Swiss-Prot record:
Protein name (record): Cobalt-precorrin-5B C(1)-methyltransferase
Molecular functions (GO terms): cobalt-precorrin-5B C1-methyltransferase activity
Keyword annotations: Cobalamin biosynthesis, Methyltransferase, S-adenosyl-L-methionine, Transferase
Pathway(s) annotated for this protein in UniProt: Cofactor biosynthesis; adenosylcobalamin biosynthesis; cob(II)yrinate a,c-diamide from sirohydrochlorin (anaerobic route): step 6/10
Source organism of the structure: Bradyrhizobium sp. (strain BTAi1 / ATCC BAA-1182)
Source organism, top-level taxon: Bacteria
GO aspect biological process, one term: anaerobic cobalamin biosynthetic process
Gene name as annotated: cbiD
Record-linked SUPFAM superfamilies: CbiD-like
Keyword Cell division appears in the UniProt entry: no
Length: 376
């Protein structure tokens, strides 16, 4: 599978989701359990009707249980699960009991409400479950076997890999999630990140948290958490997707949301950009110069903004002059965010930080006056 060239003008290889790999492993393990022989290649149906083939990396059978494993290939996507072994163990259940799922080693368990699965369930998402059930049904029809089985999914090393994901924050403990809605990983896709934003908001809402914060990066996230004393569950890894977060909150509101980010990213938001990635637009220093001029900034600061190469230069001159450029940016960013949110039931504020996590600007609402300038 290949994908049209994206950042490097070369074909990017697509990959397979953990859900697809778990389905293939479950199909192979089921065949091994029913026939005593494991296929080298298994073929499964993907959501949408396509089919895909997977090589079986390992298999074993003993004591009425059969296990098979598939190595995940994420293609060119920077996925922490790339190269992981996804294992499925299948064993018979009582007649008429249907298919049950278990979390094996390295697969997490849901502990908080707000996710697509209730607390206590293995973190095998609904679409992968449907895929596995369909694969078992297909194999059972072909082989004349039972549909009453337990399917346990395991990922060796998954508990350590999960520390690099949002699972701990979402209340998924013990390992990774089995994910996927299409069965296919698209390299550098925005969809997975935006989906994680939605899940973070859902968990915060289910927990009844009155205040959440979406941050553009780790520095601003740590800073806004310290500023407001927020629990980890209240922190949304917004990244560049300010618009995605705010539009979701429009339909799924919380009591209060803080949008937090660095000076340059919040300048982009102030300009009117809701996608803060460089591909969507650069910092418009001409816009910033005009905004500072209109706010009564000293001529030296305005001229710096007009001639600067980076937003950092403007922030440094703001420090020297004592004029709160960060507050000007925060106010403009608040206006953009307010229009995107479009829900007065949600209190909105913006916090702007420098690269050291120092608060350099803030807007608590439409009528908020600039703060006195913080100095080192």
């Amino acid at each position: 599978m290949t994908e049209t060239a994206d950042p490097l003008n070369r074909p990017l290889k697509r990959g397979w989701t953990t859900g697809s790999c778990a389905t293939a492993a479950a199909r192979a393990a089921y065949e091994l359990l029913m026939t005593g022989s494991c296929p080298a290649i298994v073929d499964i149906a993907l959501p949408g009707g396509r089919r895909a083939s997977f090589a079986v990396a390992i298999h074993e059978a003993e004591g009425g249980r059969a296990t098979a494993g598939v190595v995940k290939d994420a293609g060119d996507d920077p996925d922490v699960t790339h190269g992981a072994l996804i294992k499925a163990t299948v064993q018979r259940r009582d007649a008429g009991s249907g298919i049950a799922f278990r979390a094996g080693s390295g697969v997490g368990t849901v502990t908080r409400p707000g996710l697509p699965l209730p607390p206590g369930e293995p973190a095998i998402n609904p679409v992968p479950r449907e895929m596995i059930i369909a694969a078992i049904d297909e194999a059972a029809t072909a082989l004349g076997g039972t549909r009453d089985v337990t399917v346990e999914i395991a990922i060796p090393g998954g508990e350590d890999l999960a520390k690099k994901t949002l699972n701990p924050r979402l209340g998924i403990v013990g390992g990774l999630s089995i994910l996927g809605t299409t069965g296919i990983v698209v390299p550098f896709s925005c969809a997975a990140w935006i989906h994680s934003i939605y899940r973070g908001i859902d968990v915060a809402r289910a927990a009844g948290l009155p205040h959440i914060a979406g941050a553009t990066g780790s520095t601003s996230e740590k800073a806004v958490q310290q500023l407001y004393g927020l629990p980890d569950t209240a922190l949304i890894d917004m990244g560049d997707f300010a618009g995605g977060m705010l539009k979701y909150l429009r339909r799924h509101p919380v009591g209060r949301v803080t949008v937090a980010g660095g000076f340059a990213k919040m300048t982009k938001l102030g300009q009117g950009l809701l996608d803060l990635h460089s591909r969507a637009g650069e910092v418009d220093l001409g816009w910033l110069a005009t905004a500072l001029h209109d706010a009564g900034a000293p001529p030296e600061l305005v001229e710096t903004a007009r001639t600067a190469n980076t937003a950092l230069q403007v922030l440094q001159e703001s420090d020297r002059s004592g004029f709160p450029a960060g507050d000007v940016v925060a106010r403009a960013a608040w206006q953009t965010a307010y229009r995107a949110l479009a829900n007065d039931a949600v209190a909105l504020d913006v916090a702007v930080f420098d690269r050291d996590g120092r608060l350099v600007g803030r807007c608590l609402g439409a009528d908020h006056s600039p703060l006195p300038r913080n100095r080192r």
